[in-house]
């Protein structure tokens, strides 16, 4: 069962949300996390960029991701993006993102959100 973000207006499932944003050419991968108490979480999409993409491109990429999300019913409410230098992963399964660790990081960096 995938991870879920439970907001005041509904539940978002990572396996339905992340593929929508992962199509962006500058994005290596994304991870949906929730900030706050379950049932009232704020959805935040953590973004890991492809190698060589400059930090100065983050504002443009966030705008483009926002536009991509608006084209889908289940991603239209996601408008907060945080850029992470390299997602934490489970040491036993290198591809498995450490979402709990990432959610704590996102909560600490929430003030960086536009």
Write out the residue ranges for each language-model feature.
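Conserved C-terminal "lid"/linker of ANL adenylate-forming enzymes
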Residues: 31-36, 45, 66-114
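AMP-binding/adenylate-forming catalytic core of the ANL superfamily
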Residues: 1-74
């Amino acid at each position: 069962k995938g991870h879920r973000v439970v907001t005041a207006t509904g539940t978002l499932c990572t396996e339905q949300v992340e593929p929508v944003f992962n199509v962006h050419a500058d994005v290596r991968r994304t991870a949906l996390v929730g900030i706050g108490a379950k049932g009232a979480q704020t959805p935040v999409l953590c973004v890991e960029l492809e190698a060589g993409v400059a930090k100065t491109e983050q504002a443009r990429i966030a705008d483009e991701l926002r536009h991509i999300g608006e084209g889908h019913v289940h991603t239209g409410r996601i408008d907060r993006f945080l850029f992470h230098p390299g997602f934490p992963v489970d040491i036993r399964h290198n591809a498995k993102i450490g979402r709990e660790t990432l959610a704590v990081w996102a909560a600490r960096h929430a003030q960086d959100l536009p």
